[in-house]
């Protein structure tokens, strides 16, 4: 196995809150997959939930070396937790096609948040 990419991102939670205050659900609709949206709608801390998902997806886009463009969209990266609570990534659409083209076999995700910030790192391996 070889490391194909590494990405990290930090999000100021207050910025996400400000965007939601200004534009309602638009950011959440753009960022979240259908499964994540269902969780977001009933989450006790929806702003924090969205900030963490945004950080992971930005980190993933950086790890893939593409950013969010050329057919890639935030909602093609889905963050979920395995049976032990570890964050994982599931890919859809163009993100999945890109991973297959690059020969991605494993994606490692770490996610942390505290009062003001959410931070994520994604490593992709062949």
From Swiss-Prot:
Catalytic activity, as annotated = apo-[ACP] + CoA = holo-[ACP] + adenosine 3',5'-bisphosphate + H(+)
Organism expressing this protein natively: Citrobacter koseri (strain ATCC BAA-895 / CDC 4225-83 / SGSC4696)
The organism that produces this protein has a lineage beginning with:
Bacteria, Pseudomonadati, Pseudomonadota, Gammaproteobacteria, Enterobacterales
Record family assignment:
Belongs to the P-Pant transferase superfamily. AcpS family.
Lipid metabolism in keyword set: yes
InterPro entries annotated for this entry? 4-PPantetheinyl_Trfase_dom, 4-PPantetheinyl_Trfase_dom_sf, ACPS, Ppantetheine-prot_Trfase_dom
* Keywords from the UniProt entry: Cytoplasm, Fatty acid biosynthesis, Fatty acid metabolism, Lipid biosynthesis, Lipid metabolism, Magnesium, Metal-binding, Transferase
Give its localization. Cytoplasm
Superkingdom field: Bacteria
Q: What gene name does this entry carry?
A: acpS
User: What functional role does this protein have?
Assistant: Transfers the 4'-phosphopantetheine moiety from coenzyme A to a Ser of acyl-carrier-protein.
Instruction: Report what the protein is called.
Output: Holo-[acyl-carrier-protein] synthase
Q: Which residues bind Mg(2+)?
A: 9, 58
Query: Which GO biological process annotations does it have?
Result: fatty acid biosynthetic process
Q: What class of enzyme is it?
A: transferase
Could you tell me which Gene3D superfamilies the record lists for this protein?
A: 4'-phosphopantetheinyl transferase domain (3.90.470.20)
């Amino acid at each position: 196995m070889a490391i194909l990419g590494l990405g990290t991102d930090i999000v100021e939670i207050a910025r996400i809150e400000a965007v939601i205050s200004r534009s309602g659900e638009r950011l959440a609709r753009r960022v979240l997959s259908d499964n994540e949206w269902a969780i977001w709608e009933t989450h006790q801390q929806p702003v924090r939930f969205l900030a963490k998902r945004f950080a992971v997806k930005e980190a993933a886009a950086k790890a893939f070396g593409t950013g969010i463009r050329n057919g890639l969209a935030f909602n093609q990266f889905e963050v979920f937790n395995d049976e032990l609570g570890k964050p994982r990534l599931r890919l859809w659409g163009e993100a999945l096609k890109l991973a297959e083209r690059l020969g991605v076999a494993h994606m490692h995700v770490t996610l942390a948040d505290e009062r003001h910030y959410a931070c994520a790192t994604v490593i992709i391996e062949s």
